[in-house]
């Protein structure tokens, strides 16, 4: 299914109930989950404490029928929720209409149990395109650059020095990976 899968939370819950009753599998189109940098990050990451995300782009009139949260930030919300396995305690949201009649810049702060925080900013009004995620945890830092397909890891060693490791990934066909995952899920070979 394309995002947003429904126009309201109640419709989404209803669709989920219908799918479960009919034993129908559906998957929401979140391509970034199939980004090799995110997959590598998930294999390396333990107990994130703070996540900072920026998804900024130059104005493009192609997507002005939807606000910046549903157009851009939705990808980052999905990734953050897949990285943090804790209950949400509080969500704070701020957004502004700048050029269009819908929200063009938004900031969301999600507070989880155990003082884990994610701060997400999305804007479709910028002088440059930027898509970065920074993850802070005890004795380590990860940085994902979605545009260059690069993951960097900074780890504190036992002697209090730091080691930086970079992982560069080739551009991959995330849509193809997502479709393969869906097919394998339907055949019971993978979990979606």
Model features per residue range: what roles?
Residues 64-70, 164-173:
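A short glycine-threonine-serine/GTX helix/turn-capping micro-motif
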Residues 25, 32-99:
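Predominantly a Rossmann-like dinucleotide-binding segment in NAD(P)-dependent oxidoreductases
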Residues 1-30:
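Beta-strand-loop-alpha-helix segment that lines the small-molecule cofactor/substrate pocket
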Residues 8, 69, 73, 175:
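Short, conserved glycine- and acidic-residue-centered signature motifs
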Residues 77-150, 176-190:
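Contiguous beta-strand/loop segments that form the cofactor/metal-binding neighborhood of enzyme cores
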Residues 5, 30-34, 47, 54-57, ...:
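Short, flexible active-site-adjacent loop segments at beta-strand->alpha-helix junctions, enriched
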Residues 12, 34-38, 76-77, 172-180:
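A general structural signal for well-ordered alpha-helical segments in protein cores
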């Amino acid at each position: 299914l394309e995002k947003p899968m429904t126009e309201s939370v109640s419709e989404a819950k209803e669709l989920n109930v219908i799918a479960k009753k009919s034993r129908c599998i559906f998957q929401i189109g979140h391509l970034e989950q199939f980004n090799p940098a995110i997959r590598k990050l998930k294999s390396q990451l333990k107990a994130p404490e703070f996540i900072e995300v920026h998804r900024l782009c130059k104005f493009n009139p192609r997507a002005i029928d939807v606000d910046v949260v549903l157009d851009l930030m939705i990808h980052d919300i999905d990734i953050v929720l897949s990285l943090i396995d804790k209950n949400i305690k509080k969500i704070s949201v701020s957004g502004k209409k700048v050029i269009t009649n819908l929200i063009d810049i938004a900031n969301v702060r999600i507070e989880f149990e155990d003082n884990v925080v994610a701060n997400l900013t999305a804007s479709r009004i910028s002088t440059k395109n930027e898509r970065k995620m920074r993850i802070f945890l005890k004795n380590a830092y990860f940085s994902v650059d979605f545009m260059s397909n690069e993951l960097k890891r900074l780890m504190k060693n036992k002697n209090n020095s730091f080691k930086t490791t970079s992982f560069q990934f080739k551009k991959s066909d995330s849509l193809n990976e997502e479709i393969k995952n869906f097919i394998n899920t339907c055949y019971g070979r993978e979990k979606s």
